[in-house]
């Protein structure tokens, strides 16, 4: 095992001492399933201490009120509830407790906004009389800043390079597979040519960013169309992201962030770019929502999330207290 691999494993083990529930989420991630249209999704019918899924891989909620209007909380892993110690402490479950609505968890780990709305379409919920709330935003920007192509029609998704390699293997056969395996060995031992610059040249960050906004606008239009057809409302909420908050970090948060940096050293460049794009991205999202007619809310401005309370399990995912705080802000600011 390389020194980097040992450091990464040690960082994960230390993290698990602080947030032991993350062991369950790591296991869930290792068991993800490839599914049509969405590309990948959570494993079906899972029962772990911190998280469970139904027969479709959708996370279960607690406190359902079948006689009440159904509402959807749509998004990626923060909506799914990575970091929560149980299904009862996710945002949708907390909203079931705090409102008179019946909230469903439409969160998908590592999803972009297109995958998020596709999940809504595929589920084909017949009676959605409550609001549609999309809590998202960080994954879209992160993926747009990563190397690789970004289509203004199809967008891009996490693990796309893995999918492209598998498609290439299927197309060219064993000889090309051998070449790719050898290239992988060369890369592992630092013998491969640097390809990052070439990958980025195929689609500059500026072009990827513009394409991402175009795709996001289309996704918001779809969300608004569904809301109008069902006679309800749609909202987009920019999720809280620790580097975008003027937050006093707790001892636990400082420790967790340091361990994450130790586990994934190369992510520091992405963090710097996310910070650089912050203000422009917030402005662009607000403009798109106003244009489409979707209500907009930025939780990174919320003073309640800037207090010296332990709210984050990592920079994107929250603790039980963090998810409860977000649920209460949604109820207040969206009049749920």
Residues covered by each model-derived region:
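Generic structural signal for helix capping and beta-alpha/helix-loop junctions
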Residues: 81, 113, 141, 244-246, ...
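Histidine-centered active-site loop/cap adjacent to the catalytic His
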Residues: 36-37, 283-298, 308-336
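Conserved, well-ordered alpha-helix/loop/beta-strand core segments that scaffold catalytic motifs
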Residues: 132-136, 192-302, 333
């Amino acid at each position: 095992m390389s020194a980097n691999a040992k450091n990464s494993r040690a960082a994960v083990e230390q993290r698990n001492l602080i947030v032991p529930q993350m062991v369950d989420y790591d296991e869930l991630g290792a068991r993800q399933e490839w599914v049509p249209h969405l590309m990948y999704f959570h494993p079906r019918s899972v029962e772990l201490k911190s998280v469970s899924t139904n027969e479709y891989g959708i996370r279960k909620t607690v406190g359902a009120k079948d006689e009440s209007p159904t509402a959807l909380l749509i998004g990626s892993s923060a909506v799914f509830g990575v970091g929560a110690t149980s299904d009862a402490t996710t945002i949708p479950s907390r909203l079931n407790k705090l409102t008179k609505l019946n909230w469903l968890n439409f969160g998908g780990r590592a999803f972009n906004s297109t995958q998020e709305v596709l999940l809504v379409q595929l589920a084909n919920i017949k009676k959605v009389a409550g609001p549609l709330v999309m809590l998202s935003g960080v994954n879209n920007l992160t993926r747009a800043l990563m190397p690789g192509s970004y289509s203004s029609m199809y967008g891009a998704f996490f693990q796309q390079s893995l999918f492209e390699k598998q498609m290439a293997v299927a197309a060219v056969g064993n000889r090309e597979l051998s070449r790719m395996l050898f290239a992988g060995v060369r890369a592992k031992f630092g013998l491969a040519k640097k390809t990052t610059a070439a990958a980025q040249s195929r689609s500059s960050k500026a072009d990827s960013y513009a394409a991402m906004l175009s795709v996001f606008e289309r996704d918001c239009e779809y969300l608004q169309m569904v809301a109008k057809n069902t006679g309800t409302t749609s909202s987009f909420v920019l999720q809280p992201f620790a580097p975008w908050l003027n937050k006093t970090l707790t001892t636990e948060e400082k420790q967790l962030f340091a361990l994450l940096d130790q586990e994934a050293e190369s992510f520091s460049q992405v963090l710097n770019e996310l910070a650089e794009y912050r203000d422009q991205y917030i402005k662009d999202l607000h403009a798109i929502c106003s244009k489409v007619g979707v209500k907009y809310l930025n939780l990174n401005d919320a003073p309640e999330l800037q207090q010296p309370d332990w709210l984050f399990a990592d920079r994107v995912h929250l603790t039980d207290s963090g998810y409860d705080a977000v649920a209460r802000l949604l109820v207040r600011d969206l009049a749920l």
